[in-house]
Amino acid sequence: MNMDSGITSSHGSMDKTQKQSSEWAANQKHNQRVENTRVLMGPAVPAMPPVPSNFPPVPTGTIMSPQLSPFPDHRLRHHPLAHMMPADKNFLAYNMESFKSRVTKACDYCRKRKIRCTEIEPISGKCRNCIKYNKDCTFHFHEELKRRREEALNNKGNGKSVKKPRLDKENKFKDENFDIAVRSRNTSSTDSSPKLHTNLSQEYIGVSAGKSASDKEDTWPDFVPIDRTVLEKIELNHTKVAGKVFVLEEICKNMKGTIEKLAEKSKIDVIDKEYMKRPKRKQYSKALLTKQKMFHFRQNVLSHLTDEEFLSPINEMFTTTFKYSILQTKLVLDFSFRSASSPSSDNILYPLPRLAIAKRLLKNIKCPSLASLLHIVDVDQCLQFADVHFDPAKGRLTSSQAFLLNICLCLGATVTNFEEKQELVDEDNHETYYFEKFELWRLRSFTFLNSVYYYHKLSVARADMTALKALLLLAKFAQQKISASSAVKVLSVAIKVALDLRLNLHSTYEDLELDEIIKRRRLWCYCFSTDKFFSVVLSRPPFLKEENTDVLTDESYVELFRDKILPNLSIKYDDSKLEGVKDIVSVVNLLANHLEYVPYIQSYFLSRLSLIESQIYYSCFSIRTTLDDTLDEIIENVLENQKALDRMRDDLPTILSLENYKENMRILSLDSSKLDFEVSCCTTILLHLRWYHQKITLSLFVISIIGDNLDQRESSRHDIAEIIRRSRLDFKRNCIEVLNILKDFEYYPTVQNEFLYFSLTTVFSMFLYLSEIMVNDEHAMETGYIIGLLRDTHTRMLGSEERCLSVHNLKWQTSLFFYTFFLRSTMEKFNLTSKYAKFYAFDSNYYEGVLNRLVKHTRESKDDMVELLKTSFINKEKMAAFGSFVTEDQEKMEVSFNIFNEITIQDLNFLQFSSIPKLWENKTLEPGEEYHHSNGTNTDNNETTGADDTDDNNNNNNNNNKNGNNSSSTINNNNNNYSNSNNNDNDNNINDDDDDDDDDDDDDDDDDDDDDNDDDYSNNGADDDEEDDDYDRSLFPTGLASLLDASYPERTANDYRDENEQSNKLFEKIEGHLEHGVFFYDRDFFFKNVCVKM
């Protein structure tokens, strides 16, 4: 029964199919364009009959071929792919509309209007467009085309040459090559496919002729027929490509479902990133010498010393620098209050030196010490301001101009060497002048205070380019002489001014002259790079992001260099050569042959390095690094940043390469001054030191974060052991290269401020590395080699005859002190334990004397500040009433010092001559006795001075900070316990992060909150960080030398807690005397207010 029904059904289906085929053939004949097919080349290929199919016929409408699309608007013509569609694959017909195939030829009207022609209607004999617009549907174009083709064929048969257009040659060449490539991949399909060329041949000829006829309708162009074989190949290739495109389209549509099915069958779990394990919650910082690291250094290198022998020199240096910091801050605070409240302007500003001295100081700015600032300072402009200031007949300076003049005089006094003679040029005579040390000190301080006054006055003044220059110079001076925490406030104002001037937008520079464009762009580049530098130093988010500006892109620099600078060079380049240069590297190489434009190239690479530094901060040191990213993602970010740094160095032109920059610059500077050569060398070295600093930082960071998350090593897709091994080698190699640079670099009196931070990162990292490998004598040769490099670098930094030892810069003296302390300690350890000690013969006793001389010079600098404060802020009559400043009783007396009250003579005398008592004498008070004694003394002092309850609240804050978790001081530099971090931004390496602005930057309005809010802030901060206080936030990883494969032990929370307790115990005596013995103030509250006022 089933068999009979099946046979019957099959016969019925075949009858329907045959009937459908006959009807389809009749319909094809009826719709054929008889009068137009004669224009085609050769006989037309008959349409293929439909393939039998099991699909039911269309119930209504025109009878169609089963291979054609069922859509009603599809043209009734045979598709080229009909022969390739088997009966069981009729679903392909439903997507044939996507091919959008055209009619073989268009009528004259549609061709003229350039609209799509349609099939000829059988009834009217016209296309739809001709019917719609009531036009004659003619094909004169195709008739003329056929005539010309037949004429060309006759000429070819008679042996006459036929000149083919170039276009036909190119098309033939391309088509033949394409056909060869397709044939090699589809040989079987090519052989089995019939040569269907009619439709495509018609379309190709029509389109080609149509393009030439569209220009001139009445004049027909010469047409050369295309070989039949070529047309067949073109049509065949078209068929193959069309089929493949359709198949790919279908595959892409079903790709998502296919992947999901494969995942289900193979039981692959697709893990959402949100649920993946994160690294241990920890915010990494750039600090190197935290209390924990000092404790490790003592345990590994100086275990033979007692606590007194180890801490005595550190205690003495810290005491002096700490007092200096208070004095310098007091100087700025008192003047700020005075300038805001004084009714008379006569008592606000300090007088400037006479005109000849002022001009000498301004000219001294042109020196390598200020290499990075010379493009900001226009000395000629400042000299004009000086003439106007000293000659009222020439006018009066604006606030911005006076601001710039004072800060430039301040910088000039800073770089002037009092030991060298100075030529003073006056109107009538030349004078040889020698500055006194204290005279330069006074000039620098007075002009700085004048600059602070104009800085506060900017809030009501109009900002302009002059004010922007002055703000940038003030920020640089504050960073070098006071602290980065104070300087960052000035920098934020400078950035606001730059944004108001729209220096961040490329459109601002369109209508300016070339000189003005270069000046403004370099100012903006300096703002951007300085912001990134402070972000590195303070471990805080930068103010500016990449999306804030479109001036520092490669395209913008290419436009500036290629279109505006290169055409103005003395050596003219061909326009064709300039047009062919489109990448920044090629443009830079052309421009690098001119020394006068080297600063612009350095500016470009500095901005490029700044962008990489910004990425490093967000991917490594942001507070959300361990919250948002997995360990693998963090490692990938580190590797990407390392590649970006390597690409930048590879793109440096030869003149800026580290290997031969001096020789190249010397050749290019034959026609330039010696100063230009020295400045170019300094800026090149600074660029490389900054680059090496980032490479070293990334190496230390990746080792640290892997060491903190060894439990995720097995699940990582990276080769963790290889990454650690390579990072260690990169760290050591880069540090050695930096030391080789430093020991051969020619130092200048104050050029240390420019590269001190980057240099000290390398120096202190190497000392910590030595403390790791000196536990045993396995690496004795390597240890001796590195100590020798550190010794040579130290000798170069001291200068000939130790002339740089007495540089009047407390930051430099403090940094050099710790350098000397570590070098002496390492040499002592090597001499005691290494078998190669006699071979190297390091003299550690020499550095004991250097330490003593450094402490002496630091104390003298502090005493000079006391004298300046006396002459600046104490009324002369009041001073005379006191008589002698110093008495023996005052020198020994303990004084409670509140920095927010009016300073007295006794306070100054105490700060000048008193020192912290010896910590290990028998008479030293116990912590409890000292606390009560100092608390009572502070209370008495508050009653006599009329202090408000702020002091009591501050004392409570001190108690909270001391009794709480001390390790939190590694985040906030305020609680630094063994060096003057508050005065040294470069001592971010020497101490805990100078990061006290992190909260201030986010919310400036909270800086002036009452003390109750400050109490809450301190307590809440302690509670929030309670679980994280037991880890060391130093950038240098513990166990760097022993971090080999799986042998590195994972450290538990108890290990961190024990280490923290031991390090706190080592330094608690210094903390006790600072917080409750001699000085009384809340350091958190104090430095927040310092930042507000600055």
UniProtKB/Swiss-Prot annotation:
Pfam families: Fungal_trans, Zn_clus. GO terms for biological process: DNA-templated transcription; positive regulation of transcription by RNA polymerase II. Residues 935-945, 953-989 have a biased composition (Low complexity). It is found in: Nucleus membrane; Mitochondrion membrane. Residues 1-12, 19-29 have a biased composition (Polar residues). Residues 107-137 bind DNA. It is a single-pass membrane protein. GO terms for cellular component: cytoplasm; mitochondrial membrane; mitochondrion; nuclear membrane; nucleus. Keywords: DNA-binding, Membrane, Metal-binding, Mitochondrion, Nucleus, Transcription, Transcription regulation, Transmembrane, Transmembrane helix, Zinc. It comes from the Eukaryota. Residues 990-1031 have a biased composition (Acidic residues). GO terms for molecular function: DNA-binding transcription factor activity, RNA polymerase II-specific; sequence-specific DNA binding; zinc ion binding. Residues 1-33, 927-1035 are annotated as: Disordered. The chain crosses the membrane at residues 755-775. Present with 573 molecules/cell in log phase SD medium. Involved in tolerance to thiabendazole. This is Uncharacterized transcriptional regulatory protein TBS1. It comes from Saccharomyces cerevisiae (strain ATCC 204508 / S288c) (Baker's yeast). The lineage of its organism: Eukaryota, Fungi, Dikarya, Ascomycota, Saccharomycotina.
